[in-house]
Amino acid sequence: MDLSNLTLTKIQELVLTRKCKIYDILLAYKNNYELNKDINGYIEFFDDSLEIAKRYDDCLKNCELEDLPLIGMLIAVKDNISIQDKSLTCASEILKGYISPYDATVIKRLKNKGAILIGRTNMDEFAMGSTCEFSYYGATLNPLNREYVIGGSSGGSAAVVAAFQAPFSLGSDTGGSVRLPASFSGILGFKPSYGGLSRYGLASYASSFDQIGFFSHSIEDIALILKHTCGSDKMDSTSVDIFDDFYPLKIESLQGKNLAVIKELSEDLMDKNVANSFAKFKLDLLSKGINIKEVSIEEINFILSIYYIISPVEASSNLARYTGLCYGKRISEGLSLNDFYFKHRSNFLSEEVKRRIVLGNYLLSERYDSKYYAKACEILQNLIIPKFNKLFESCDFIITPTSFVKPFRLGLDFDDPVKMYYSDICTVIANLIGAPAISLPYSKDEEGLSIGMQIIGRSKKDFELLSFSKNVIRELGLNGI
């Protein structure tokens, strides 16, 4: 049996029936990592995870299983989620050497229930990017074709699951940062409803949109981990309860479900391979008795602009804390305070991060605040969110391709950053309206590159979305393990 090709639920079944030790399974994943380090999915593999695995094996031997429903479950973690006594750098030189003094709420809930954290994964610096090339630690490669990007910003978390270096991983999703790399690497990527998982301990990029998400080969694993990590948290006032009676996920017919396709997201705008796959996806769903209607949402044309106005504004505020006085790496020259701030941030932040900070400050300036930022917030709250709420009164889910484009070639020089930002046009919808969304691996092109399909559900109906996705995977025969 290949011990590095298992779901979390299968791992637990094997260890609870004493057919395998947690240590041996973890060692198989670590060996895969050692053999394929060039993918650069991990920033650090935790050596102490092997000792924790041994300790849990002893617990199993002595039948000490009380309150450990996730025992034996191995999880990699994106480098912007706090783990006590572990390095946290957000893949930035400016945080080099910083050790987190506390656990994020999601991490604490996983640890308390027996999960083992096995490493921290690469990412675009401060979660700003769509390729996972903007990292202090170098680019993460796509395991399906190493000449192409894996997508970002949670590219490392996607890569370690796709390359069977971890059975499950945590990422963060602000505008598609879980779903895009999941689509590009041929695995499942799930973003919960806004507030469904506590953001306490997640390094902030754009607080209105940030959400911890999951990568896996198994929809059941996603539902299980969501069950044990979701819910309100006194440390995060935006957190909410989302658990409902759709768990455990049930096998049900797709017959009679109502799906919406947004007219303005035209197939004419998509890469040819993506357009063909999306057309086939719709035909496959229709053949299962699903109703699909095309709806017009003219405000969709504002979606990307609104996201790239609000997110850099919030980023410019959130990243103001990285001055060199409290966190991470410091320069040692004797400078005035303002010169110290300027030199520190100029030296240790990447060009992409500086670009978004400058844009955010520009949009907040007295001259432009009401023209851009205030207007974007007004359109989002008064037009876009109500329009989608109205749409969900007559449909169960919205379907789109996860991305209009295929993976980019590594090292592609984006002289116009908007070309890269355009890859987020389908995924930002769920973040702006606070809805859950998932990317399903659907097809591959002639170069072996994966094309994913996105399903968006109703806000706070995460398990309903996962249940429907399970049945889509089952009835369409989509690949998984």
Curated annotation (Swiss-Prot):
Catalytic activity: L-glutamyl-tRNA(Gln) + L-glutamine + ATP + H2O = L-glutaminyl-tRNA(Gln) + L-glutamate + ADP + phosphate + H(+)
EC id: 6.3.5.7
Cited InterPro entries: Amidase, Amidase_CS, Amidase_dom, AS_sf, GatA
Molecular function terms from GO: ATP binding; glutaminyl-tRNA synthase (glutamine-hydrolyzing) activity
Keyword field: ATP-binding, Ligase, Nucleotide-binding, Protein biosynthesis
Pfam families tied to this protein: Amidase (PF01425)
Protein biosynthesis found in the keyword field: yes
Active-site residues, record numbering mapped to chain: 78 (charge relay system), 153 (charge relay system), 177 (acyl-ester intermediate)
Subunit structure: Heterotrimer of A, B and C subunits.
Physiological role: Allows the formation of correctly charged Gln-tRNA(Gln) through the transamidation of misacylated Glu-tRNA(Gln) in organisms which lack glutaminyl-tRNA synthetase. The reaction takes place in the presence of glutamine and ATP through an activated gamma-phospho-Glu-tRNA(Gln).
Family that this chain belongs to: Belongs to the amidase family. GatA subfamily.
Protein name from the UniProt record: Glutamyl-tRNA(Gln) amidotransferase subunit A
Gene source species: Borreliella burgdorferi (strain ATCC 35210 / DSM 4680 / CIP 102532 / B31)
